[in-house]
Amino acid sequence: MPRRKQQAPRRAAAYVSDELKAAALVEDDVEPEEQAADGEPSAKYMCPEKELSKACPSYQNSPAAEFSSHEMDSESHISETSDRMADFESSSIKNEEETKEVQVPLEDTTVSDSLEQMKAVYNNFLSNSYWSNLNLNLHQPSSENNGGSSSSSSSSSSSCGSGSFDWHQSAMAKTLQQVSQNRMLPEPSLFSTVQLYRQSSKLYGSIFTGASKFRCKDCSAAYDTLVELTVHMNETGHYRDDNHETDNNNPKRWSKPRKRSLLEMEGKEDAQKVLKCMYCGHSFESLQDLSVHMIKTKHYQKVPLKEPVTPVAAKIIPAARKKPSLELELPSSPDSTGGTPKATLSDASDALQKNSNPYITPNNRYGHQNGASYAWHFEARKSQILKCMECGSSHDTLQELTAHMMVTGHFIKVTNSAMKKGKPIMETPVTPTITTLLDEKVQSVPLAATTFTSPSNTPASVSPKLAVEIKKEVDKEKAVPDEKPKEREKPSEEEEKYDISSKYHYLTENDLEESPKGGLDILKSLENTVTSAINKAQNGTPSWGGYPSIHAAYQLPNMMKLSLGSSGKSTPLKPMFGNSEIVSPTKTQTLVSPPSSQTSPMPKTNFHAMEELVKKVTEKVAKVEEKMKEPEGKLSPPKRATPSPCSSEQSEPIKMEASSDGSFKSQENSPSPPRDACKEASPSAEPVENGKELVKPLSGGLSGSTAIITDHPPEQPFVNPLSALQSVMNIHLGKAAKPSLPALDPMSMLFKMSNSLAEKAAVATPPPLQAKKAEHLDRYFYHVNNDQPIDLTKGKSDKGCSLGSGLLSPTSTSPATSSSTVTTAKTSAVVSFMSNSPLRENALSDISDMLKNLTESHTSKSSTPSSISEKSDIDGATLEEAEESTPAQKRKGRQSNWNPQHLLILQAQFAASLRQTSEGKYIMSDLSPQERMHISRFTGLSMTTISHWLANVKYQLRRTGGTKFLKNLDTGHPVFFCNDCASQIRTPSTYISHLESHLGFRLRDLSKLSTEQINNQIAQTKSPSEKLVTSSPEEDLGTTYQCKLCNRTFASKHAVKLHLSKTHGKSPEDHLLFVSELEKQ
């Protein structure tokens, strides 16, 4: 290939010294007119141009020009036209014989070249037969080059017309060109060189990485973003516009300075995607071209800075829809195709298009790559596309629409009703003619305004983002129309009345009225949920993903059953105090909140849907509700108007919900942060009345009646399944609740206590308290605390009250039942685990267990308040400190929060599942669903947690051959380690019996034993068995050491320290706080 002739670097005039410019331009002796302006500013060259310079000063030769670019843009159309046509003529002079003759007077340097004479020449030129088919008038010049026309210096910045060259009109003429010719002429690049004053490449780095500072060359002002610099240049006129059409075929033309075309360097596709106006979708060769485009068209004012608009592929009219008479070309890239523009649209519609939305053109080149299914008409019909098909509200961004759909659940309804009708959800719009298209676009695109105002947000789009996470299941199960958002969105519907007449087949409210309104559908879906949960529980398959925190495992479903099963002991207490929510661990009835709780900002909540449901299923419940609403109406009128869902829920003392759902419903459905129920409720409590009706229900309650409301025994068949279903719904959806203030929440404090408290409660079984005594203590307990937020540790002190109710709310009345502190403590733990945090998911198997027991009638298997009540207050205080630091937030060690007893059971079961092969090696076999169910029922661990624990152990054993309690399994000589006493055992059978001695019962009896019997056995056998297992020289001293946190005894201080650090995460230095010495018996 012949070597290219060595040339000086090719530069545009803006960057070349005057001498070089003069020298270079002299070679092109065709256009002496331009030399006059390009050369050194001498009288010889300047005189003939004097008059022209006044009208359109060159920025190079007249630094003190009278007109800024702003003024130039606002010059009359006539002068703009003449100046533009001057540029045009100089650029097309070579190949146009006719124009050469016209040009001759211009080459003469006499004063006769006046502006008027030039105007006449240009008018004559425009009326030339070559241009006749363009039908352009002076106000709409095209400045489009013929493919053959070229000019060697057309990209220089020196011609007189450069200041007022109307880039905007040139671009619009191109983008709106209607090709009626059959032949396609090659089109030069859309926008030729534009010189922005930029700094060295070192300062800027790559175009794509951006710059630390963008400086204006004229005044040296620094800006952080290119947009700010562009705005500044536009306001002050500190820029030069040399947008002249050039022809790529001419080798002598001046190329872009120091900035090789990105189209060559980076590949056309990439460069065009990057250097594209986000507003109108045009691609540019260089950043300078794009910037001047922004300045001239003011598009930078219309592009939202933080959230760029989707590339407007909205404008391409599909070929199928084009009318033959109005064929629009769709070139695939700026350089590929072009042609002589033909203006077939009337001036009126052209002006309309130019003034209202100049960017809506058929020329967007990437529409079909950006998801042509909807994007090709995106910008033009954004208000119709980003529109909720359920309630008709329009949104500015897809994110806002998504948030709206999630919050209101409209996406479920729209999809369902569309499927039922067999309708496609969105149909392709019909755009029959260009004029109608233009009219609709003018109406529907607010972006065309030149001020920096994005389309006005509809009220719906401002709906709180907090609610985005609100449960999809809730929305699925409720097809009740959402009234409030519709009212809020009416203004937006009025703004868009034209949408109704548009050709889009969106679903309307009328369509949705045909879909079922709820009622039986909700029951059916809940029924499905329950049956699938029960099936999963029976099959033993894990329900859903693992627990981020091991605390999520402790859901204690059988303790739930105890509390929920003892519903017979509850009685509808007449509310004697104003604004507290009655939550008792032994009450199961879930009367849905009356409508006064509907003052919340989120109109669609469980309360509303379930209220309607209850009314449909049984009107008797509604009667009960009304009875209870009356006293409430008298007692708490001020609270009823509270808009917060939390407080409006707390304002209803009649909702005696089961502690499993009532106590956290307010958090679950509330977009606002959950309030501390205790703080809110306590000041107005009148605890004197608390114990009044406590004794009455005991006789009937102990007989195992499942009457939810003891005043209305015949109604129980109606209420019980509903309360069960509702508790399913609440617990099932509880994982979506995200309380924002867990620290203020009594539930989170309960969660801290749950692990060790349940253990301690299980240890001893003192005689049961009489009902009267309980009533008295109840009153005393609440008298002490009625004026301040409750101290959660008081439940462990020597008031033998029902712990769960005390913890849940200081004003909640606790019926004196014979259920033990174990029951209530674990129930409160369940509440905190099941409801409080999104981290604590709930497996459906636990729900199914609870449900099975809800519908059966049975008495609670309960022992009585435990030895905790006999402990000293000092003891209680240290326990409080100890338990403050147990949860995972404080301790990061793995498995540190497992209940040690549960671990022992799991490890023993795992060891029992090992099978020895003929070669003497052990292979792991899976636990059967029945075995897992037994463990789950006893420990309260969910099936999912058990499955995950087993899977984790198996994974560790396969990967490393060992885990915490078992090493060397793969060698055939396993070593089992006891978690409690660190002894090492060689065979699975010995290990199992060893662990059973710790546990105090045999694993095979696990399924047969009731919780109480196991607790009794633990209390009886724990100390002796551990003394047998651990031996130490210190034993002779006659002392054993007991861990205060879990009441285990150890023979040596070392063992206790080891236990404290391993099991409870305590520092050995603190062992004095948590260890009590016992005399050897």
UniProtKB/Swiss-Prot annotation:
Chain spans, region Disordered: 25-104, 141-161, 238-257, 325-346, 474-499, 626-699, 792-824, 855-897
Record field: compositional bias (Polar residues): 660-670
Induction notes from the record: Up-regulated by BMP4.
Coiled coil location: 606-630
Skewed-composition ranges (Basic and acidic residues): 68-87, 238-247, 474-491
GO molecular function, one term: zinc ion binding
Modified residues (Phosphoserine): 682
Subunit structure: Interacts (via N-terminus) with HDAC1 and HDAC2; the interaction is direct. Found in a trimeric complex with APBB1 and HDAC1; the interaction between HDAC1 and APBB1 is mediated by TSHZ3. Interacts (via homeobox domain) with APBB1 (via PID domain 1).
Family: Belongs to the teashirt C2H2-type zinc-finger protein family.
Protein known as: Teashirt homolog 3
Gene this protein is translated from: Tshz3
